[in-house]
């Protein structure tokens, strides 16, 4: 009986402390909600880029979808660095 209890406790801790990270990132979830697909670097010819999923992944969606879905932009605090004016 004690062996079963010990195995059950070890199984519970191994499930709770697993190093696997589940779920999607917020940008990937946003892309899937807009019926998009995360692709590396470039979208197909018949797809429009509607956002970004990760660092080098873009959110692509086919432009001929019958039901129009608004594509809200995700605003971020990042701003491009100012370029010096050369004379």
Curated annotation (Swiss-Prot):
Tissue specificity is:
Constitutively expressed in all regions of the ocular surface with predominant expression in the uppermost layers of the corneal epithelium and lower levels in basal layers (at protein level). Also detected in some keratocytes in the corneal stroma (at protein level). Expressed in all layers of the limbal epithelium with no expression found in limbal keratocytes (at protein level). Strongly expressed in the conjunctival epithelium with decreased expression in basal layers (at protein level). Also strongly expressed in tonsil tissue (at protein level).
Picking any one GO molecular function of the record gives: CCR6 chemokine receptor binding
Annotated signal sequence is 1-22
SS bond list = 31-59, 38-53, 43-60
Give me the Gene Ontology terms describing cellular component: extracellular space
On induction, the UniProt comment says: Down-regulated on the ocular surface following inflammation and bacterial and viral infection.
Q: Please give the family membership noted in the entry.
A: Belongs to the beta-defensin family.
Checking PANTHER family in the record gives: BETA-DEFENSIN (PTHR20515), BETA-DEFENSIN 109B-RELATED (PTHR20515:SF3)
Q: What is this protein called?
A: Beta-defensin 109B
Q: What is the lineage of its organism?
A: Eukaryota, Metazoa, Chordata, Craniata, Vertebrata
């Amino acid at each position: 009986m004690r062996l079963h209890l010990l195995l059950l406790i070890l199984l519970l801790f191994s499930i709770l402390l697993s190093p696997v990270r589940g779920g999607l990132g917020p940008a990937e979830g946003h892309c899937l909600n807009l019926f998009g697909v995360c692709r590396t670097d470039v979208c197909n010819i018949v797809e429009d880029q509607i956002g970004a999923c990760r660092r080098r992944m873009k959110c692509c969606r086919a432009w001929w979808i019958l039901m129009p879905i608004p594509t809200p932009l995700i605003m971020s605090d990042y701003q491009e660095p100012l370029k010096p004016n050369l004379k």
